[in-house]
Every structure is written in C-alpha cells, then in structure tokens.
Design a protein with these regions (language model features):
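TerminUS-proximal long segments
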Residues: 256-302
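Internal mixed beta-strand/loop scaffold within catalytic domains of large alpha/beta enzymes
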Residues: 47-121
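Long, charged, mostly alpha-helical binding arms that flank functional sites
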Residues: 145-200, 214-217
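Short conserved micro-motifs at the rims of enzyme active sites and ligand-binding pockets
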Residues: 74-76, 134, 191-192, 251-257, ...
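Compact, glycine/acidic-enriched structural inserts
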Residues: 114-158
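An amphipathic alpha-helical core segment
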Residues: 163-181, 217-262
Length: 302
C-alpha cells in the first residue's frame, strides 16, 4: 500500500509538470510560477500559477503530498482505522479570459488511513455560454476512458455523482454542464484491485488535455463584448459560492490546517455580484441557465 501511494504521488507530480508545459504553450502569453511549500504537520507541495495570460486570466495547477492527524469529526466519516492519514494529489482550475471559453476543474487524489487506501477525483466543465458540441466532446472523452476501464470506470454512475456533487442548493442549479466525479474508489464497498484503480486514474489524468484544450482553442477566437464579459464575472460568482460553501476539498483543507494560498487558488481573479439580475428570456444567457441541470449529453440513457 505504501508503494502504491508513493507511485501515485510521483505520477501526480509528473502530471503537474506536463500540464503546466502544455497549458503555458497553449496560452502563449504567460508562464507558470512555481512555489514549493512545506506543511508544518508533515509533507508539502508545489503550487504553480499562471496569471494575466492571453488564453487564461488565471490558471492554477497544485500538487501536494501531505500526512498528519485528522480532526476526529472528519476521521470518523472516512474509511480505515485511527486518525493518521496520508494524502497526495493534483488539483487544477483554469479561468479563461474570454467568456466564450469555459472554466474547467479537475483533481485526482490518493489517500490512506489505517489499512484503507482509496482514490478520488474527476473533471468538470463550467461554460458561460452554451456550445453543445463542447459539452458532448468533454463528456465523450471522459466516457471513453471510463468504458476502457470498466467496471472500475463507471461513466454513468460518475456522471450522476458529478451532477449531484456540483450543485448549488441555494441557487437551484448545477455549477456547469458536469463531467465525472468519484470518491472512495477502493473503499466503501468498491474493493477493486489497487493496480487497476491506479491505471484508471492515470488514464483519466492523461485525458484531461484532449478533453478540454480543443474546446478552449476553438472558442478563444469567438468575439465578445462588455455584455458577455459582465455575464462571465457574474457567473464566476456562482463558482466562488460553491467553492467556499460546499466544496469538500476546500473544507477538508481548511479543517486540516492546509495551505490557504493553495486551497483558495481555485478562485477567479475577478468576480462580481449584482443585485437580483436575471437573464433576459430567449437570450444566450438564458439558454445556459436552462441547461444547468442534469443532462444526458451523450444520450446513453435508455
């Protein structure tokens, strides 16, 4: 188990380097900074952030491998004995400059506690304007990986999990058009072979670029004006609301004395809240809102 954890940590670190290389090249206007840090309780990580780019207004790709003692109220809800834990993973959020390019998030992680080891992760897409082809492409790329690793990769289940997880109850809408989400893979009734789980997670990590980058490059040439930019900033407000109120990773990090700068890296650089603003009926903004609910983008149901 210890060997698999170390291999996972190494893979996530290598994936961080590769993603930053590819994303900086795609941006063409800025580079990622690198900030290595140590956690007082044990372990550390590397935060890599690109700001003020041509394609990305802000992009962050974090890697960490930490260990320590969990608070009792968290430990009792997790698999394994005791309160000692180890966690490694990669987390990324890309906030594009153009409102025609969707924001995206992905993370892949491995945790151990007592005799339990499990994987978690996923990837999701948050557009500001709806392009159906983009949603289909993103979902199809992830579904192909899941199908290749069935039954461990269960696209239909992970997609439904994503729709449920990335939901803002106080707004009555999903954060975006979804993707996949999974947790406790290898624990809580999913006793899959560890090596096969790791193969699946590695394949997913490598699929992120082909799932997202063609969308970003295609939409970056779309024209937009002040109306679209204002809409983007308002919709970013929903992103902030979810991350600070509901996101499990954010709350876990804050409750385990995590590094605040890394935890809040996911927040966009600019955002706005305007009082009681509604999308105009029949507008492209209204079209997006109408699709912020579980949608069978690949028409696999039935």
């Amino acid at each position: 188990m210890a060997d698999l954890f170390e291999r996972a940590a190494k893979f996530y670190a290598e994936l961080q380097s590769e993603l930053c290389r590819v994303l900086a090249d795609a941006d063409g206007g800025s580079e990622f900074t690198s900030d290595a840090w140590q956690r007082p309780g044990g372990g550390g990580g590397v935060a890599r952030v690109l700001e003020g780019g041509a394609l990305f207004e802000k992009a962050g790709v974090n890697w960490s491998s930490v260990d320590g003692e969990l608070p009792a109220e968290i430990a009792e809800h997790m698999p394994g004995q005791g309160r000692s834990f180890r966690a490694c993973g990669i987390s990324l959020v890309l906030h594009p400059r153009s409102p025609m390019v969707p924001t995206t998030h992905a993370n892949f992680r491995c945790l151990t506690k007592g005799d339990a080891l499990w994987f978690g992760g996923g990837a999701d897409l948050t557009p500001y304007y709806l392009f159906r082809d983009d949603a289909v492409h993103f979902h199809q790329t992830l579904a192909t990986v899941c199908d290749r690793h069935a039954p461990i990769g269960d696209y239909d289940r992970f997609k439904a999990w994503c729709d449920e997880y990335f939901f803002l109850p106080h707004r009555g809408e999903t954060r975006g058009v979804g993707g996949i989400f999974f947790d406790y893979l290898g624990a809580k009734g999913t006793p899959h072979p560890p090596e096969q789980m790791f193969d699946f997670v590695q394949d997913l990590g490598k699929a992120f670029v082909p799932a997202y980058l063609p969308i970003a490059q295609r939409r970056s040439t779309e024209t937009y004006g002040d109306l679209e930019r204002t809409w983007q900033l308002r919709r970013r407000g929903r992103y902030v609301e979810f991350n600070l109120i509901y996101d499990r990773g954010t709350l876990f990090g804050l409750k385990t004395n995590g590094r605040v700068e890394s935890i809040l890296m996911s927040l966009p650089p600019l955002v706005r809240w305007d009082y009681d603003v509604m999308a105009t009926p029949g507008s492209r903004e209204a079209e997006l809102i109408s699709h912020l609910r579980p949608t069978d983008w690949l028409q696999r149901a039935g």
